[in-house]
Amino acid sequence: MIYKNNGIVPEEIYNGNPIEGRHNHSELEYVMKGMLDGVLAGRKLTDKWDDALSRTLDAYLGEIPDEFSYNGNNYSPKSFFDELEINPDDYIEFTSYNNRNYYDWIELEIPDNWTNDKYFNVPIKDILEIMDNALSNGYSICWDGDSGKDHFYRNEGYAVIPVDDEEKLEDRTEPEKEKEITEDMRIEAFNSFDVTDDHLMHIVGTAENQNGTKFYYTKNSWGTKDKKYDGYWYMSESYVKLKTVAIMVHKDAVPKSILEKIK
């Protein structure tokens, strides 16, 4: 909806003013929060705060161009979006929580869903079926989930859900045995904030370890410096079962048997 209403701009035209070659939004976040906390403390809104916030964003990220030249052509953000011929309505967001009806649209109650989008709620086995079908047919997957807990090994480049939570990584001499993940485990982890929507990544393939355990090959956004697999991670199937909050795929990537259930 944001793209359809506002358009899109190439990164080389609007790069968000990266500082020292990379983005660092911490200062911007603190400035915005301080400003908005001050606005709220006044208890009565004036007509100035919106403009002040917009100017702050412009100072840190740059002004959004009304028109720009790209590859020898002139565009507005809206006309460039039209040129790309991307239809946002062709993409479907799926989630999986058993406290809500399956095969129905739900409003996923997470901070990142500030646009109040609807997600199609399916069993977790369907999430995996959608992912596998997408990858086997040349589609990638936008993954929304949790990467902030103990078993997302940042230096080693992989993520698992080991049976033995206490075993130290350095003590392991072979691949970990992993927990069998259930629907009840998923909703318990979500409701207890053990799983949050703290990160988004791009799943582009699969792999297996020496024991035949399936892993999803995942492009991260943390750069390549000091990363074992050049910015990619391997998430085990058990990790994906437990830690996935939602996925987004093109409608043509969804198995027909599941697509037919979408109302």
Regions found by a protein language model. Name each.
Residues 1-75:
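Papain-like cysteine protease catalytic cores
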Residues 53-263:
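Active-site signature of cysteine proteases
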